[in-house]
Design a protein with these regions (language model features):
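Glycine-rich active-site loop/lid subdomains used to bind and stabilize high-energy intermediates
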Residues: 15, 25, 128, 286-293, ...
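Cysteine-centered catalytic environments shared across enzyme families
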Residues: 1-315, 327
């Protein structure tokens, strides 16, 4: 099986005069393992169905209790339900977490769909005009619809042209008619009628130029520690991937040495010596004094093409990165060890502008502002371009043509 869960299932159907809807949920229990926290969860005011985790749920729970709200569980799901009961869509701004959610307000007869600030949790939809389907995977929607869809060849061409780094170029999915729910947004249905998508958060950088280098480093360190501390809130065993990379090494160090948590560590052991990082990994493990809780994982034997096919079919999209295959092997090992919650070092490139396609997307976004573009392009041409190995990502004009027209036009 490809997933760590599920360990519980639930459904809720509501029939109204002019429409009806059904929430379906399969649960991987992490917080409050009791069946009282299964989903969809319902109280007198609303119904919630969500995939994800609300990391600041204890702080939000205290806020609700101060307003007289009573709780029956110790789960983040119930806290999310109460927050949306109290604040509606404005409550999304209060959440620190990652989620794909569907919420129904009984009094207002309103449904809200939403996705987290960075699209960590997947959410796809298919809108026929009369029916609206949504799920964490495209394959689930196809099963609900009882039909299959044709490939979106323009999307496939983008993937072939730019690789996994081009998978976020547009909101369209790899199958025709399917779309990815927009990031940091929500959608309302009032009495069954769909309204426009709205943003609840925008990533507008606030630059503090007064900070020196040490202050900047200390600030990042403090933010990392606080973030990881919140994410340790779980009632299940915790694992952590560790490689020679700086991101996973930092996370492992904070968890083990600063927060003093005993967790299981997992590393990938490649068959090829060209990709062997074991010397640096072992130094990390020695420094953490974690040899007794560290495990090397290899890719499973058998038919690798079948494994790859299963992963792609389950997700409904190609791999974002070759490391997804390795991550699958580690997750399988974790499941065998009954280790459910997991820290992984990823997105460091995104945070510190290491993804070259992000530079190109920025240049495209300011292309019409001649003065701003010329300055940014000169900087990219001088400092960034020489570091790029892919010929496609070194050719800005070709990239621009693909974005503005059709990726097949340059073939």
């Amino acid at each position: 099986h490809l997933r760590r869960g599920p360990n519980a299932f639930g459904n809720k159907t509501v029939h109204k005069d002019n429409y009806s809807f059904t929430f379906l949920h399969s649960r991987l229990s992490l917080i409050d393992l009791n069946q009282r926290s299964d989903q969809p969860m319902e109280d007198d005011e609303g119904v919630i169905c969500f995939n994800g985790e609300i990391y600041n749920f204890l702080e939000l729970k205290k806020n609700c209790e101060e307003k007289g709200v009573k709780f029956k569980t110790s789960s983040d799901t119930e806290v999310l339900l109460k927050i949306l009961n109290l604040y509606g869509p404005d409550g999304l701004k209060k959440l620190d977490g990652d989620w794909a959610l569907a919420y129904y307000n009984k009094r207002l007869d309103k449904i809200i769909l939403s996705k987290d600030r960075f699209s960590i949790r997947p959410l796809f939809y298919y809108d026929t005009g009369n029916e609206f389907y949504f799920a964490s995977t495209i394959t689930h929607i196809m099963k609900l619809m009882g039909s299959k869809s044709k490939l979106n060849f323009k999307r496939v061409a983008n993937y072939i042209s730019f690789g996994f780094k081009g998978t976020n170029l547009d909101p369209n999915a790899f199958f025709s008619g399917f779309n990815k729910f927009p990031t940091a947004s929500y959608l309302e249905f009032n009495r069954g009628k769909k309204k426009a998508y709205k943003k609840y958060w925008s990533n507008i950088p606030q630059i503090n130029s007064s900070l020196n280098y040490k202050q900047s480093v200390d600030l990042v360190k403090d933010k990392l520690i606080q973030s990881i501390k919140l994410r340790l809130r779980t009632d299940k065993n915790i694992g952590c991937s560790i490689s020679a990379g700086i991101d996973s090494s930092i996370i492992a160090g904070i968890v083990k040495k600063i927060l003093k948590k005993d967790i299981e560590f997992y590393s990938y052991a490649p068959h090829s010596k060209d990709y062997d990082e074991s010397d640096l990994i072992n130094l990390n493990i020695e420094n953490l004094k974690a040899f007794n809780t560290h495990k090397y994982v290899t890719l499973p034997g058998g038919n690798p093409l079948k494994t790859l096919t299963d992963i792609v079919l389950d997700a409904g999209l190609p791999l974002n990165s070759p490391s997804d295959w390795l991550f699958h092997a580690i997750c399988k090992s974790m499941k065998e060890d009954e280790c459910t919650a997991f820290f992984t070092g990823s997105a460091g490139d995104d945070l510190f502008s290491g993804n070259y396609i992000d530079h190109l997307n920025y240049l495209v976004s300011i292309y019409k502002d001649k003065k701003k573009f010329e300055k940014a392009y000169a900087n990219w041409d001088k400092k960034i371009k020489r570091l790029i190995r892919s010929p496609y990502l070194k050719d800005f004009n070709g990239y621009l043509r693909n974005i503005k027209n059709d990726p097949l036009a340059s073939w």
